[in-house]
């Protein structure tokens, strides 16, 4: 399978079989998208998040708002944060992820679309998606040196020098 934006005029072969040219490739649950730089798709995580959230929010027996938010953060949000340590979403993609979470919180507390749920989320003690991504990324980079791998340690030091 050939992955990339530039497609060659001639067929590439491996083990005497033609390599297939693709625009997206799913690897370890993450969809990598073809382009000038490495990008990732949010469509699959958003679909799984919304599916889990709809199941939770449309249950025939309603639990308390506090329990529902706890379940939302325990069951649904991990669909959005899977592999977040390694992913670099665009600001538009990150905005879409935040909107999905905020819409669910609005549904739980019967807020209107124009009402902010930031203060509500903070009062309940739940982190924002930005805080979750930052915390997990920092923890990932802090544990990298334990691997005793010179290449990974070099890459880790370069990635934090840029910040």
Give the ranges of each region predicted by the language model:
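Acidic catalytic cores of enzymes that act on phosphate-bearing nucleotides/polynucleotides
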Residues: 110-163
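Short amphipathic alpha-helical coiled-coil/interface segments
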Residues: 76, 97-108, 137
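Short, conserved micro-motifs composed of acidic
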Residues: 1-24
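Short, flexible/disordered secondary-structure transition segments
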Residues: 82, 86-87, 94, 115, ...
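A glycine-rich phosphate-binding loop feature that marks nucleotide/adenosyl-phosphate handling sites
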Residues: 1-6, 93-97, 118-126
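Amphipathic alpha-helical interaction motifs in eukaryotic regulatory proteins
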Residues: 50, 57, 77, 105-106, ...
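Basic, alpha-helical interaction scaffolds
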Residues: 16-88
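Short helix/loop capping segments that flank catalytic or ligand/cofactor-binding pockets
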Residues: 11, 35-36, 141
């Amino acid at each position: 399978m050939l992955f990339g934006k530039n497609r060659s005029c001639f067929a590439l072969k491996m083990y005497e079989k033609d390599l297939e040219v693709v625009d997206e490739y799913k690897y370890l649950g993450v969809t990598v998208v073809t382009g000038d730089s490495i990008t990732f798709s949010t469509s699959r995580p958003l679909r799984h998040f919304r599916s889990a959230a709809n199941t939770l929010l449309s249950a025939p027996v309603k639990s308390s708002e506090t329990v529902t938010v706890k379940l939302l953060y325990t069951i649904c949000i991990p669909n959005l944060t899977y592999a977040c340590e390694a992913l670099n979403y665009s600001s538009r993609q990150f905005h879409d992820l935040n909107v999905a979470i905020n819409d669910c919180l609005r549904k739980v507390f019967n807020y209107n679309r124009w009402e902010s749920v930031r203060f509500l989320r903070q009062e309940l003690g739940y982190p924002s998606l930005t805080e979750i991504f930052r915390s997990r990324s920092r923890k990932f980079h802090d544990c990298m040196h334990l691997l005793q791998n010179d290449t990974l340690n070099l890459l880790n030091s370069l990635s934090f020098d840029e910040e």
